[in-house]
């Protein structure tokens, strides 16, 4: 990971000329990493978790670390198979301009996603009620406290944006874009990103958030801006719940 002070003066997305993993291979590696980390190890951790903790902060952290580890192994395997270094294959670099992702993430959380739900709530008020949308996050915040709150913030604001952007933008969006074109890859990866969270009520918002993160990659060809945007998006949501819950 590096901070590069230079700029992309040509205005051409680097993803269009950077190496990528073949889409079928990318999906196979993701599937293996997600299944082993999320289903196998995650299931074991959940089964062994204490009744008091339930799906609280400690269990969430352990499950997240297990899932992230397996996904990172999948990314490392992709690098070995393509004989390309990690930074180059997934576009992992940062520039100072990527800090624009901070206000973009905030705006996406407080304006863009809520606007998406307005027509959905008008048509299906009970399904897309705000309490249903916030249910999972509120449960996590309620289970935290003291040092567990710090741990929750690290998981949500640091770990999740870094690993998820590497996987869903660095691996899958770049691979899908090589096969389907930049716009096709953007939409496919964004919808996929919403689906894998396995909460239908959150699918529209997460897919739109994925579009925002993906556009940052598409515009820069690097993950720096998308990671910062994702972190800002998550931070806005979690701190709002911590302050107003």
Where do the protein language model's features map onto the residues?
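N-terminal, membrane-interfacial amphipathic/helix-forming hydrophobic leader that caps
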Residues: 1-99, 118, 122, 150, ...
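N-terminal start-of-chain detector that recognizes signal peptides
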Residues: 49-50, 60-63, 128-133, 164, ...
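Membrane interface segments of multi-pass transport proteins and intramembrane proteases
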Residues: 50-53, 91, 121-129, 175-183
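Transmembrane helix-loop-helix hairpins at the membrane interface
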Residues: 111-114, 134-245
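Alpha-helical transmembrane spans of integral membrane proteins, capturing the lipid-embedded, hydrophobic core
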Residues: 27-39, 64-72, 102-110, 114, ...
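Transmembrane alpha-helix/helix-exit interface in multi-pass inner-membrane proteins
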Residues: 106-131
């Amino acid at each position: 990971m590096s901070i590069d002070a230079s700029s992309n003066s040509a205005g051409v997305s680097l993803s269009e000329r950077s190496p990528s993993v073949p889409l079928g291979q990318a999906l196979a590696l993701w599937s293996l990493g997600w299944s082993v980390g999320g289903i196998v190890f995650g299931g074991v951790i959940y089964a062994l978790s204490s009744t008091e903790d339930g799906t609280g902060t400690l269990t969430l952290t352990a499950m997240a670390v297990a899932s992230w580890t397996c996904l990172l192994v999948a990314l490392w395997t992709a690098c070995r198979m393509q004989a390309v270094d990690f930074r180059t294959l997934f576009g992992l670099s940062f520039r100072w301009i990527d800090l624009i992702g901070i206000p973009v993430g905030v705006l996406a959380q407080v304006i863009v996603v809520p606007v998406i739900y307005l027509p959905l709530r008008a048509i299906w008020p009970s399904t897309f009620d705000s309490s249903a949308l916030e249910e999972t996050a509120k449960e996590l915040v309620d289970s935290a406290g003291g040092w567990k709150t710090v741990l929750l913030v690290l998981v949500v604001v640091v770990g999740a944006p870094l690993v998820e952007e590497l996987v869903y933008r660095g691996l899958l969006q770049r691979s899908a874009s090589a096969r389907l074109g930049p716009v096709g890859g953007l939409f496919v990866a964004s919808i996929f990103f919403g689906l894998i969270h396995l909460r239908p009520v959150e699918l529209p918002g997460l897919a739109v958030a994925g579009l925002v993160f993906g556009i940052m990659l598409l515009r820069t060809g690097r993950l720096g801006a998308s990671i910062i945007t994702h972190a800002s998006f998550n931070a806005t949501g979690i701190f709002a719940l911590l302050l107003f819950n």
